[in-house]
């Protein structure tokens, strides 16, 4: 990722962390990162993997798209590229991504926020995908919907695969309360 993308991503993570009243140490610990690594990411100096960004989204209890919304170019590593196409703002929240996987790629994904599902439609190539214990082969034009709050994966054979991924997050209560610690006082925020 280039410097402007890393800076934007870092600011998004830091803003969400502070809004949720989490310390740098607490978020780093919860996400399984070294505090120094999270600090570098927030400052735009780190180079987080897609899995690291997903873990941070899960720990912040926000959709992945909230962290990468301002990133216009594809994010990628190890033969996988992902680009946010659009974000919904309704309840339940729906985000749409374009994803490309290189030949002979296995992309293992950690569980997302509880209640999340993914619906993937294969555009080109061949793909084996779904929950780890219920993988499905997809033909071009076919869609597979599965629980994404459990370990799941995407696996290609000797060809590239391109797909659309629709992530639907669990419906949220209408009036949720979050607390942000400011000068040892709690401020009630309605979302």
Write out the residue ranges for each language-model feature.
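DNA major-groove recognition helix of helix-turn-helix/homeodomain DNA-binding modules
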Residues: 51-66
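A short glycine-rich, His/Asp/Glu-containing loop-to-beta-strand
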Residues: 76-111, 166-167
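Short acidic-glycine-tyrosine-enriched beta hairpin
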Residues: 132-149
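Glycine- and acidic-residue-biased ligand/ion/polar-headgroup-sensing regions
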Residues: 115-131
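Short basic helix-loop element that most often maps to the first helix and adjoining turn
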Residues: 11-28
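Histidine-centered metal-chelating micro-motifs
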Residues: 106-108, 144, 149-153
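Ligand-binding loop in jelly-roll beta-barrel domains
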Residues: 148-173
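Recognition helix of helix-turn-helix/homeodomain-like DNA-binding domains
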Residues: 32-48
